[in-house]
Design a protein with these regions (language model features):
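Extended substrate-binding grooves/exosites of carbohydrate-active enzymes
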Residues: 1-221
């Protein structure tokens, strides 16, 4: 089903000019003429100013943000959302892209940004899922990506030709721990998942057991 029409994606990467703004107004008008029943939206690149002529053209708006991966820290996402909302309470705001890479054979006891570990990816999505849960005024959030996917130009985490931001591996067979973060938030049926099962080689006398569940309590035997 078509839910809404997007008129552009990260268009300000190349800069802004009046012709660009005018074209977006023309596209908005055309969308409404062709289909007045659906909303229109735009996906702003992260560096797009929070005020300016590219805002309030479409019915709703979204940003592509990667704080905690390409730059900055994941904890910047919540404050940024709050600041934008305070400055623009009339704009219906969403997040059209967010994510970080996680490779299922990379693991860490001290996960951190850009280590490509499954553990860091899970921590990142734990934060983001809660950030959206705490802000009911966000109209939509779109994780990038459901599945790892091919990308010839990439060479990330020792893997060539693949973007590893998926919650599931490229062959659709292995659900990463980050997948179960969202299942714990959204699943109606009872679920439980013990994370870190692929992190088999660990140092130390004790280990932390992390569990994702939509139940109030779980018991580990």
């Amino acid at each position: 089903s078509i839910m809404f029409w997007g008129i552009s994606n990260e268009i300000l990467i190349g800069g802004i000019c009046q012709e660009l703004v005018d074209t977006h107004h023309d596209l908005q008008k055309l969308c409404k003429e062709l289909d007045p029943t659906r909303l229109t939206t735009i996906a702003h690149v992260s560096t797009t100013p929070t005020t300016g002529p590219m805002h309030r053209i479409t019915d709703v708006e979204s940003y592509n943000h990667y704080f905690g991966w390409y730059g900055g820290k994941m904890e910047q996402n919540g404050p940024w959302l709050d600041k934008f909302h305070a400055e623009n309470p009339d704009i219906c705001l969403g997040i059209s892209e967010y994510g970080c890479e996680g490779i299922i054979n990379w693991h860490s006891n001290t996960p951190q940004c850009k280590d490509y570990s499954e553990e860091y990816q899970a921590l990142y999505h734990e934060y983001m899922a809660q950030a959206f849960e705490d802000r009911p005024w966000i109209w939509a959030s779109h994780v990038w990506n459901m599945f790892d996917f091919g990308c010839a130009a990439r060479s990330e985490g020792g893997v060539k030709g693949r973007n590893n931001k998926g919650l599931v591996t490229i062959d659709r067979k292995t659900r990463k721990d980050s997948f179960y973060v969202y299942q714990a938030y959204w699943a109606k049926d009872p679920m439980v998942h013990i994370a870190g099962r692929r992190h088999a080689q660990r140092a130390g006398e004790t280990t932390e057991v992390k569990v994702y569940s939509n139940q109030d309590t779980v018991t580990l035997y």
